[in-house]
Amino acid sequence: MVRTRTQGGGGHPSDCWAGLIAVAQDIDADMNTLFKAASLAYDVYHALFKSSNLRDKGIDNAFYVTVSTAVGASFLLGLSRESFAHAVSLSVVPNISLGVARTGRLSMWKAGASANAARNGVFAAIMAKEGLTAPELPFSGERGLFQLSSMFDLNFEKDQPKIFQAHMKSYLCDYHSQTAISIAIKLHSKVDPAQIEKICISTYWFAWNEVASDPSKWQPSNRETADHSLPWIVSGVLLDGDFGEALFTSERFNDPLIKDLCSRVEVKEDTELTSLFPNRMPCRIKIFLKNKQTIEEYLDLPNGHPDFPISDGDLNQKFLKLATQTVSSSQAINILNHLQHMDLMQSSRKLFDGCLVT
């Protein structure tokens, strides 16, 4: 899935897809129309994201999902200009999501916030289609969004569709840990974890703030916190040599080996690295060994960045690795083969025909 936007703070425009697919299948839209709706949703997400930076005002990126899903769904439903405007207003006015969902010791709601947002975006479009009216000036009106955010202009850049500039994750965790994971995998073959005295991770400010600024990141007790913990993830990969679900089991959260190594991790912002963000996602890991030697690695582009695109082969392997946790290998391969030809499907209702598991 084309997953993440990084400029301005963070977020996942791909969270719009489930809502858009639901609408498309309900009205039996063709796949080409669904793709157009998704591209439009990404463009709106990007424009909001770049123009407003609502994160600084305490508003979660799930808000962008609500608005962009409403726009994509309105396109699918063929709303008139007037109804389209009501759908946007209905997505904005009742749906201010708070960023506290992604701070401190994270809860299960972190995983539900954007799904709820997409659902609300679909609901806004459906209600507008049925004739429900909404405030005419949701942004600039009295007590509108601008009173919370300050005024901003939506700038729609006219180069290529923004879906092509979104980032893909190689690893199923926060995007700002992706570069560090690749470094840690490389370092695993060079160090004996038992000989590590200290691990110093230098990164850009946003990565530090997102995945290493809270004490809970050093003592995660659930998946939600652990997969947004840079010290935990790096410690686990240094021990295991790879990234996987084994890092997020209840047994692992009580493993004294990884807990001890995690306690030896220091994460700090490097202003030089901050200056490279968001065009680069730089990270430097320096390991201090008990024999006084040091080992250091640096990387500034994770696999899946628009300037370092993930290959089809790597993407397929990621899908199969995740899918086979739920279905058999043969079933996963069949599903993958089916989805790889979705652009040839006439009806969006055929999208899941090859995904049925018996």
Regions found by a protein language model. Name each.
Residues 13-15, 63-66, 311-316:
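Short acidic alpha-helix initiation/capping motifs at coil-to-helix transition points
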Residues 23, 74, 187, 191:
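Hydrophobic pocket-lining residues that define ligand/cofactor binding sites across diverse proteins
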Residues 1-30, 37, 44:
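Function-dense linear segments that define catalytic or interfacial modules
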Residues 24-117, 130, 137-142:
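Glycine-rich, mobile lid/loop segments that gate access to catalytic sites or pores
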Residues 14-21, 65-72, 118-123, 177-181, ...:
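Well-ordered alpha-helical segments within folded domains of soluble proteins
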